[in-house]
């Protein structure tokens, strides 16, 4: 699509100013285009980048244990992000001993759904995979998952409740 966005307030380094923005094939260009779109009364702002999102989980499972179609959940996630001006998002997915949506099995299912949806998103959705460091028996499996799905952002976590363990408590998932 080639067009000029006219009549809007454009956010520039000095603030909002009335200006014209020209686009060609999704890229800002200097050369005016033939088609004009009047955006009088609107603002043109840059997209927001969310580098660590975990609010998307409610779209994958509307309530605890109610995991449905992960692809549909990703579509709903993207729609909410876009509606809020987020054009680039990193979805933070656990790979943990904590189970449920944080389990290695769920991480695989999530990454599979995300990979199957590749190319269908209008926003830039990537994944941050959060690995629990105490899962020593899983390092090779985790590495293979990262390579298989080309995950570019990995975080190493330690969610072991050290203080509780120090006073003799043992959380159910650690028994």
Where are the predicted features?
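Histidine-rich, glycine-flanked metal-binding segment
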Residues: 1-45
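Residues that line or immediately flank small-molecule/substrate-binding pockets and catalytic motifs
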Residues: 12, 93, 158
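Short amphipathic alpha-helices and their capping/turn segments at secondary-structure boundaries
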Residues: 34-35, 39-42, 74-80, 139-154
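Metal-associated gating/positioning segment near the N- to mid-region
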Residues: 43-109
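Metal-coordinating catalytic core of metallo-dependent amide/deamination hydrolases
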Residues: 96-100, 105-175
């Amino acid at each position: 699509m080639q067009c000029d966005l006219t009549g809007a307030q454009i956010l520039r380094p000095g603030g909002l100013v009335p200006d014209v923005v020209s686009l060609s094939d999704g890229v800002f260009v200097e050369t005016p285009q033939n088609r004009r779109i009047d955006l009088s009364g609107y603002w043109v702002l840059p997209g927001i980048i969310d580098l660590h999102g975990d609010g998307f989980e409610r779209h994958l499972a509307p309530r605890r244990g109610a995991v449905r179609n992960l692809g549909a959940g990703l579509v709903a996630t993207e729609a909410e992000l876009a509606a809020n001006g987020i054009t680039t998002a990193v979805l933070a997915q656990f790979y943990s001993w904590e189970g449920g949506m944080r389990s290695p099995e769920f991480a695989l299912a999530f990454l599979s759904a995300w990979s199957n949806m590749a190319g269908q998103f209008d926003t830039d959705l990537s994944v941050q995979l959060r690995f629990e460091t105490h899962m020593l028996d899983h390092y090779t499996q985790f590495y293979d998952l990262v390579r298989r799905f080309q995950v570019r952002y990995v975080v190493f976590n330690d969610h072991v409740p050290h203080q509780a363990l120090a006073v003799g408590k043992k959380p159910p998932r650690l028994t």
